[in-house]
Amino acid sequence: MYGFEALTFNIHGGYLEAIVRGHRAGLLTTADYNNLCQCENLDDIKMHLSATKYGPYLQNEPSPLHTTTIVEKCTLKLVDDYKHMLCQATEPMSTFLEYIRYGHMIDNVVLIVTGTLHERDVQELIEKCHPLGMFDSIATLAVAQNMRELYRLVLVDTPLAPYFSECLTSEDLDDMNIEIMRNTLYKAYLEDFYNFCQKLGGATAEIMSDLLAFEADRRAVNITINSIGTELTREDRKKLYSNFGLLYPYGHEELAICEDIDQVRGVMEKYPPYQAIFSKMSYGESQMLDKAFYEEEVRRLCLAFEQQFHYAVFFAYMRLREQEIRNLMWISECVAQNQKSRIHDSVVYMF
């Protein structure tokens, strides 16, 4: 703890911190996952989840179940928890909680714009959007032909508006430009969130700095790997990296010139916190990289609960619940497709 935060935190934040720690206690354990892995069909999964926090959300769902139904209902639990915390929060906690949903808003914008580019039905796309990232004018995203129109017609009245200053070009929207837009928006969002947490100070600043720096570094690695072999120049690649994190600035200089996965690995192994992640991979492969990053993120998120009187527990809980939903989606898909031998390939255990 820092200063006298502990003396005053509980006045406005104590109730919600108790609530979120209660939610954390309701996350699935390793024993739950072991039981889920034994399920023979989706109804078995529903039956096991009926004894968890997801029970009330799935109890009225008729058979036959689909994976999308399970994911949708479990996501509804996450959304309800978030809305309850947000309506109880006062400043600056309410602003902190709002920041948590901006990433989903960016993903929804990219989903709608990409789907429209490929002539998908707008209503179908909206149904696939994450509920935490919804905003009033989201359906009108389909009319935009370039970045300027996207901003002027739709996004100027959303919280994402300040992040668009680097994206305002008249270039037509194509797959490459949309992906650049996504990463530019995420860069601006992460830097803004990081600066906000620094202003809060104390344990919140310390823990969130670590969590957001890890997120920024992971995105830098993914941007590098995904842009290898594309027409994106080294300078353009470097512009997409966030201006903070363990890799900033020298790691970014090296990542910008990488031309294959082994060169990326060589850069990352110079940083002790990331050596363990890349040691799990054989040379030339990147399939296990996402899981290794998720495992490291979960470890850091769980550590956020070791301290009290800070806001990082809210961020950590939301991320852990999202990881849990990804786990349930993977398990459900494997069971539905009779691929139970692959269940452990992507499940990230928490407790």
Curated annotation (Swiss-Prot):
Cystines in this chain: none
Entry's Gene Ontology molecular function annotations: proton-transporting ATPase activity, rotational mechanism
Statement: the UniProt record of this protein carries the keyword Magnesium: no
Topology versus the membrane: Peripheral membrane protein
Keywords: Hydrogen ion transport, Ion transport, Membrane, Transport, Vacuole
Principal subcellular localisation of the protein: membrane
SUPFAM superfamilies reported in the protein's UniProt record: V-type ATP synthase subunit C (SSF103486)
Cited function: Subunit of the integral membrane V0 complex of vacuolar ATPase. Vacuolar ATPase is responsible for acidifying a variety of intracellular compartments in eukaryotic cells, thus providing most of the energy required for transport processes in the vacuolar system.
Subunit structure, as described in the record: V-ATPase is a heteromultimeric enzyme composed of a peripheral catalytic V1 complex (components A to H) attached to an integral membrane V0 proton pore complex (components: a, c, c'', d and e).
PANTHER family associated with the record: VACUOLAR ATP SYNTHASE SUBUNIT AC39
The protein's name in its UniProt record: V-type proton ATPase subunit d2
Originating organism: Arabidopsis thaliana
